[in-house]
Amino acid sequence: MKTLQELTRPNIWRLKPYSSARDEYSGAAASVFLDANENPYNLPHNRYPDPMQRDLKLELSKIKKVAPAHIFLGNGSDEAIDLVFRAFCEPGRDNVVAIDPTYGMYQVCADVNDVEYRKVLLHDDFQFSADELLAVADERTKMIFLCSPNNPTGNDLLRSEIIKVINDFEGLVILDEAYNDFSDEPSFLSELGKYPNLIILQTFSKAFGCAAIRLGMAFASEGIIGVLNKIKYPYNVNQLTQQQAIEMLHKYYEIERWVKTLKEERGYLEEAFVELPWVLQVFPSNANFFLARVTDAVKIYNYLVGEGIIVRNRNSISLCGNCLRVTVGTRAENAKLIGALKKYQ
C-alpha cells in the first residue's frame, strides 16, 4: 500500500488540530474546573464529555479484543464515513470505488465532498469480483468501499474476494460490518493487524439496539485513527451516549441473546414468505433483515402502509426491481406482518 502520508490530503497531514480544555487536562485529581467556560450548575450535564472517550474505548476493547488506540468513535458510523473522505480524498481530483447496490451514505458523502464515486455492479447472486473492482481503480482512487453483510442485499461478500481487494489495492479498504453480529461469518477484527490499509466500521445501532444514541465505531491502524482524531469535532460523542454505551457493554450477554432471537425470527419470516403466492424469491440473508422479490413491490408496500406496517421498498435500487427489504422484528410484529400479507389480494 501507499504510505499513510501519501494517502492523506497534504493540508490534513500538516494540520494542527484544535486543542480543547479537556485535551489539555484529563487528569482525575482536580476538584475545581474553571478552564472550559462551563456553567457550574446542573451537574453532571454541565461538563464537557471526554473528547477521546477513554472509559468507553477501554470497555469496548475488552469485548472487541482491539486496543483502544485502534478505535475511533463517532456520531454514528456516518461520521467515520464522512471523515475518511475529508481526510484522504482531494475534492475534484480523487475517486473512490464501491459495489452496487450498497449502503447509500457512501455515495452521499462522496458527493458532498466532491469526490468521484465509481460503482461496480454486483453479480446476479449479489457477489462481486475483486478483479472487476480493482480494474475500475486508478492512480487517483483513494478508497474502496465494501459492506458485508451487504445492505440492502443481506448476504456476506466472499471472504476470499475481500482479502484479495485488501492485498492488491494500494489505497484504503473500508469494510462496513454493521450487520456482522447477525452473521456466522467471523469479523475481520481479529485480522486487523495484518492489513494496515483496512478500516472496519461497526455500529451500536443494530445488534446493540441503540440506534437512538448515534454511536459508530471505526477500527484501524493507530496511524489512521490518529488522522481521524485530528479532524473530528472536539466533543463528537456526548456524555449521555458514552454512558449508555458502557451500560450496554456491561450487559453484553443481553446483546448476544437478542442476536440469537433475531436470527431465529429471521428464519421464521423467511419460511413464511416463501409460502406466499406473490413472493417470487427470498434472498438468503446474514443480517437482521432480508430481501424478497415480489410481483408488485409498490402495490404491496402501499397495502402494508395502509395496515400500519412499514417495510422498505427497494424497487428503484440496482438489481432490486420489485424487491422489499424486511427488517426482523419481535415475534408479535413478525406475526402481524405475516397475518396482513396472507390477507393481501
Swiss-Prot record:
One of its GO terms (biological process) is L-histidine biosynthetic process. The modification N6-(pyridoxal phosphate)lysine is found at residue 206. It comes from the Bacteria. Its EC number is 2.6.1.9. It is an enzyme of class 2 (transferase). Pathway: Amino-acid biosynthesis; L-histidine biosynthesis; L-histidine from 5-phospho-alpha-D-ribose 1-diphosphate: step 7/9. The keyword Nucleotide-binding does not apply. InterPro entries: Aminotrans_II_pyridoxalP_BS, Aminotransferase_I/II_large, HisP_aminotrans, PyrdxlP-dep_Trfase, PyrdxlP-dep_Trfase_major, PyrdxlP-dep_Trfase_small. Keywords: Amino-acid biosynthesis, Aminotransferase, Histidine biosynthesis, Pyridoxal phosphate, Transferase. It catalyses: L-histidinol phosphate + 2-oxoglutarate = 3-(imidazol-4-yl)-2-oxopropyl phosphate + L-glutamate. GO terms for molecular function: histidinol-phosphate transaminase activity; pyridoxal phosphate binding. Its cofactor is pyridoxal 5'-phosphate. It holds the Pfam family Aminotran_1_2. HAMAP family: HisC_aminotrans_2. Belongs to the class-II pyridoxal-phosphate-dependent aminotransferase family. Histidinol-phosphate aminotransferase subfamily. Homodimer. PANTHER family: HISTIDINOL-PHOSPHATE AMINOTRANSFERASE, HISTIDINOL-PHOSPHATE AMINOTRANSFERASE-RELATED. NCBIfam families: hisC (TIGR01141). This is Histidinol-phosphate aminotransferase. It comes from Bacteroides fragilis (strain ATCC 25285 / DSM 2151 / CCUG 4856 / JCM 11019 / LMG 10263 / NCTC 9343 / Onslow / VPI 2553 / EN-2).
